[in-house]
Swiss-Prot record:
Binding locations of substrate: D61, H62, H63, S78, T79, H80, E81
Function: Involved in tetrahydrobiopterin biosynthesis. Seems to both prevent the formation of 7-pterins and accelerate the formation of quinonoid-BH2. Coactivator for HNF1A-dependent transcription. Regulates the dimerization of homeodomain protein HNF1A and enhances its transcriptional activity. Also acts as a coactivator for HNF1B-dependent transcription.
Organism: Mus musculus
EC number: 4.2.1.96
UniProt-listed InterPro entries: PCD_sf, Pterin_deHydtase
Keywords (A to Z) from UniProt: Acetylation, Activator, Cytoplasm, Lyase, Nucleus, Tetrahydrobiopterin biosynthesis, Transcription, Transcription regulation
Gene name in the database record: Pcbd1
SUPFAM superfamilies for this protein: PCD-like
Family of the protein in this entry: Belongs to the pterin-4-alpha-carbinolamine dehydratase family.
Expressed in which tissues: Mainly expressed in the liver, in pancreatic cells, and in the kidney, especially in the distal convoluted tubule, in the cortical thick ascending limb of Henle's loop and in the connecting tubule.
Name the record gives this protein: Pterin-4-alpha-carbinolamine dehydratase
PANTHER family in alphabetical order: PTERIN-4-ALPHA-CARBINOLAMINE DEHYDRATASE
EC top class named in words: lyase
């Protein structure tokens, strides 16, 4: 990924986070990160979702923290490089939303 990631400013957060909050992303208490839990019809759909996200994450060299049990996928996004939320997290969360919508 080009350029060093920078932590989002308060102004950038005010501009970028409302759309994600509107679709269920929440800020993690005590950590500069965002989180969302996804539910799918079954394990195959959950795994397909994770596969599509993984391919994009690898392409972007920006990887989620995630946990999967059967049809549930929990995702936390934060940028290690800047120890907090960056535009990379916002972009990946937006992509994740597109994938989730396409699989329901």
């Amino acid at each position: 990924m080009a350029g060093k990631a920078h932590r989002l400013s308060a102004e950038e957060r005010d501009q970028l986070l409302p759309n994600l909050r509107a679709v269920g992303w929440n800020e993690v208490e005590g950590r500069d990160a965002i989180f969302k839990q996804f539910h799918f019809k079954d394990f195959n759909r959950a795994f397909g979702f994770m596969t599509r996200v993984a391919l994009q994450a690898e392409k972007l060299d920006h990887h989620p923290e995630w946990f999967n049990v059967y049809n549930k996928v929990h995702i936390t996004l934060s940028t290690h490089e800047c120890a907090g939320l960056s535009e990379r997290d916002i972009n990946l969360a937006s992509f994740i939303e597109q994938v989730a919508v396409s699989m329901t």
